[in-house]
Amino acid sequence: MTNIRKSHPLLKIINKSFVDLPAPSNISSWWNFGSLLGICLMLQIMTGLFLAMHYTADTTTAFNSVTHICRDVNYGWMLRYLHANGASMFFICLYLHVGRGLYYGSYLYKETWNVGVLLLFTVMATAFMGYVLPWGQMSFWGATVITNLLSAIPYIGTTLVEWIWGGFSVDKATLT
């Protein structure tokens, strides 16, 4: 007599998707980090959109807009902390995901690995833009440290820094 989960038409679909999943027998919890990355990314996008609704572009009122979000917006303090800690969690999951790929030898699949490296560089560039270039609330320290890494590139480094900032160093909020 066959098991009902293997013979019933609807239960057979669920069984093949969840119970008898066609996955390697040595799969571990390390393989969850791709899904966790997606969850963290959705959290960042949603909280970022809600925070942007109460955002002030002027440098003189930037601190007041943060105070407004934390005090006057319903659960604004939670949005702010979820956004800040979600970014940290995103990068922790990202590095663990890459570490899992290194540990299990995923770099041997050249095309897949190259797509992953390209995605990693894209994430880093996006994080740079989100951390350094918000309207009126630029982090001077972050901008200086990150762009001074560009100045270490031989021959073109100083030219790159001057091109990005319009001068030798960061001066004011760039986008207001």
Curated annotation (Swiss-Prot):
Binding site residues for heme b b562: 83
Membrane topology: Multi-pass membrane protein
Compartment annotation: Mitochondrion inner membrane
Cofactor(s) needed for function: heme b
Transmembrane regions: 33-53, 77-98, 113-133
Cofactor note: Binds 2 heme b groups non-covalently.
Major subcellular location class: mitochondrion
Keywords: Electron transport, Heme, Iron, Membrane, Metal-binding, Mitochondrion, Mitochondrion inner membrane, Respiratory chain, Transmembrane, Transmembrane helix, Transport, Ubiquinone
Pfam family, one: Cytochrome_B
PROSITE patterns in the record: CYTB_NTER (PS51002)
Cross-referenced CDD domains: Cytochrome_b_N
Keyword tRNA processing: no
Source superkingdom: Eukaryota
One Gene Ontology term, aspect cellular component: mitochondrial inner membrane
UniProt record, GO biological process: mitochondrial electron transport, ubiquinol to cytochrome c
UniProt: heme b b566 binding residues: 97
InterPro entries for this protein: Cyt_b/b6_N (IPR005797), Cytb/b6-like_sf (IPR027387), Cytochrome_b_N_euk/bac (IPR048259), Di-haem_cyt_TM (IPR016174)
GO molecular function: metal ion binding; ubiquinol-cytochrome-c reductase activity
Entry keyword Electron transport: yes
Note: Heme 1 (or BL or b562) is low-potential and absorbs at about 562 nm, and heme 2 (or BH or b566) is high-potential and absorbs at about 566 nm.
Subunit structure: The cytochrome bc1 complex contains 11 subunits: 3 respiratory subunits (MT-CYB, CYC1 and UQCRFS1), 2 core proteins (UQCRC1 and UQCRC2) and 6 low-molecular weight proteins (UQCRH/QCR6, UQCRB/QCR7, UQCRQ/QCR8, UQCR10/QCR9, UQCR11/QCR10 and a cleavage product of UQCRFS1). This cytochrome bc1 complex then forms a dimer.
Family: Belongs to the cytochrome b family.
Record function comment: Component of the ubiquinol-cytochrome c reductase complex (complex III or cytochrome b-c1 complex) that is part of the mitochondrial respiratory chain. The b-c1 complex mediates electron transfer from ubiquinol to cytochrome c. Contributes to the generation of a proton gradient across the mitochondrial membrane that is then used for ATP synthesis.
Designated name of the protein: Cytochrome b
Source organism phylogeny: Eukaryota, Metazoa, Chordata, Craniata, Vertebrata
Gene: MT-CYB
